[in-house]
Curated annotation (Swiss-Prot):
Any one GO molecular function term: asparaginyl-tRNA synthase (glutamine-hydrolyzing) activity
Catalysed reaction, written as an equation: L-glutamyl-tRNA(Gln) + L-glutamine + ATP + H2O = L-glutaminyl-tRNA(Gln) + L-glutamate + ADP + phosphate + H(+); L-aspartyl-tRNA(Asn) + L-glutamine + ATP + H2O = L-asparaginyl-tRNA(Asn) + L-glutamate + ADP + phosphate + 2 H(+)
Name under which the protein is recorded: Aspartyl/glutamyl-tRNA(Asn/Gln) amidotransferase subunit C
UniProt family annotation: Belongs to the GatC family.
Function (record text): Allows the formation of correctly charged Asn-tRNA(Asn) or Gln-tRNA(Gln) through the transamidation of misacylated Asp-tRNA(Asn) or Glu-tRNA(Gln) in organisms which lack either or both of asparaginyl-tRNA or glutaminyl-tRNA synthetases. The reaction takes place in the presence of glutamine and ATP through an activated phospho-Asp-tRNA(Asn) or phospho-Glu-tRNA(Gln).
Subunit structure: Heterotrimer of A, B and C subunits.
Enzyme class, broadest EC rank: ligase
A Pfam family matched in the record: GatC
A Gene Ontology BP annotation from the UniProt entry: regulation of translational fidelity
Keyword list, A-Z: ATP-binding, Ligase, Nucleotide-binding, Protein biosynthesis
Organism of provenance: Neisseria gonorrhoeae (strain ATCC 700825 / FA 1090)
Superkingdom of the organism of origin: Bacteria
Xref: HAMAP family: GatC (MF_00122)
EC numbers for this chain: 6.3.5.-
Length: 96
């Protein structure tokens, strides 16, 4: 699958990006390189290969949960401008 400049134009428009002609050409090349790599990966025969969560054998060193610090929330919240139900109240910065 190869993209065209029209595809890049559409992606840029949907993403609300304004790209120069040079940026469009560069994006086209980079996207086509990605698709080429994906196609190569899809053509690899993986029959008989077990799925794995991690490529390396990992043994986690587990330990008991122990409290190592005291609860200092009251101390921290004492200097906050506004706290309600142990939550910091901050000005709204994102419109609904």
């Amino acid at each position: 699958m190869a993209l065209t400049l029209a595809d890049v134009d559409k992606i840029a428009r949907l993403s609300r990006l304004q790209l120069t002609a040079e940026e469009k050409e560069k994006s086209l090349q980079e996207l086509n390189d990605i698709f080429t790599m994906v196609e190569q990966m899809q053509n690899i025969n993986t029959d008989g290969i077990e799925p794995m969560a991690h490529p390396h054998e990992v043994a986690l060193r587990l330990r008991e949960d122990e409290v190592t610090e005291t609860d200092r929330a009251a101390e921290y919240q004492a200097v906050a401008p506004e706290v309600r139900n142990r939550l910091y109240i901050v000005p709204q910065v994102i419109e609904e």
